[in-house]
UniProtKB/Swiss-Prot annotation:
Entry binding sites for [4Fe-4S] cluster 1: 134, 139, 145, 380
Binding note for cofactor: Binds 2 [4Fe-4S] clusters per subunit. One cluster is coordinated with 3 cysteines and an exchangeable S-adenosyl-L-methionine.
Pathways involved: Protein modification; protein lipoylation via endogenous pathway; protein N(6)-(lipoyl)lysine from octanoyl-[acyl-carrier-protein]: step 2/2
Organism, as annotated: Uncinocarpus reesii (strain UAMH 1704)
Domain Radical SAM core as annotated: residue spans: 148-369
Gene3D superfamilies tied to this protein: Aldolase class I
Transit peptide: 1-26
Protein name: Lipoyl synthase, mitochondrial
Swiss-Prot/TrEMBL cofactor(s): [4Fe-4S] cluster
Residues noted as binding [4Fe-4S] cluster 2 in the record, renumbered to the chain: 165, 169, 172
Amino acid sequence: MAVCARGLRCLGTPAVSLRLAASRSYATTTPPDPAIPNTPGAAATSSPAKRPRTSFQDKLNAGPSFSDFLSDKDDARILDPAEAYALKTALVGPKGKKKEYTRLPPWLKTSIPDSNNYKRIKNDLRGLNLHTVCEEARCPNISECWGGGSKSAATATIMLMGDTCTRGCRFCSVKTSKAPPPLDPHEPENTAEALSRWGLGYVVMTSVDRDDLPDGGARHWAETVMKIKQKAPNILVECLTGDFDGNLEMVALVAKSGLDVYAHNVETVEALTPQVRDRRAGFQKSIRVLKAAKAAQPSLITKTSMMLGLGETEEQMWDALRQLRAADIDVVTFGQYMRPTKRHMPVHEYVRPDVFEFWKEKALEMGFLYCASGPLVRSSYKAGEAFIENVLKKRRAESTGPGSASVQDVATGDLVR
């Protein structure tokens, strides 16, 4: 504007006419104050009127600075455990119909996923038409697992046989249908390709339940494991399967396919199973599945997981742990149940971190090989993978031989039949 003004002055045009023209051209220009003479000298010396101070601005200026929030010198602001674990409530809803809800505790809050590893894994999955339980089940750990600090640290749990389940458990957000789409015949190959790209040492796979299939998808499972082992022989594979509707022959087929960890979740204590899981599932049925897997392949590590916060009692927890240990299950994990949507069963209790630590100690005392326990721990959570990976590598080093090859030969024969 100043350049234009100098140019117009050279042509003998008054600066006042320039200002009037500009005010007509730009509707957002502040009109001149009538109390100030409309002269070139006044325009040069006047300053814009200051906005009135507000009470909010005064409070903000009087409050602590940003550096005060970052400083930990003030010991008075450090919370004791009782204060830190205290749950806060909020009234939500229209006036006159407000309901009291318990706010999410701070120990259950996670960061929003945004990293190069996260984007890379997501692109690989979309390009190969693969699904993950991380997305379908709305896992709170997705930013940590997908956004690992390095390529080898990032991982995702592949969900086989599509994204639609034939069962409807009250805690799960995966889509349900009595007649889901047919299996993708390219999925075993695509899964093996994706996992080999990521260069991981340990992978976890799970699946939806497919009660619409005669074998429950067991042969699809076995084929996928064998494809992975062909592309990456040294990779360790954990399979979190369904119960195949209690068909123990299909359980044995998957157990002999070459996997390293056979996982199947009991989800909750026996007394709450009818209210939490689909009517076709059962606590004792799940125990039989894990026993059959170990019987078919004794070298396998067997694993199960339970959610806390569903209303279970301490005695029910003790009973569940005793039954799991009697079934020779090696690994157990505990995590907080978090309601995916309003259509699912509500959270009965947000269990404190020290309670999770208590059950971890008790599980290890009972003889479990490993226990991962914490509010954000999930059955396919990578917190325990490093420990299990080291155990498996140690076992592999101690007993090298044709065992793994014969396992795959048996599985291949079963697939042909």
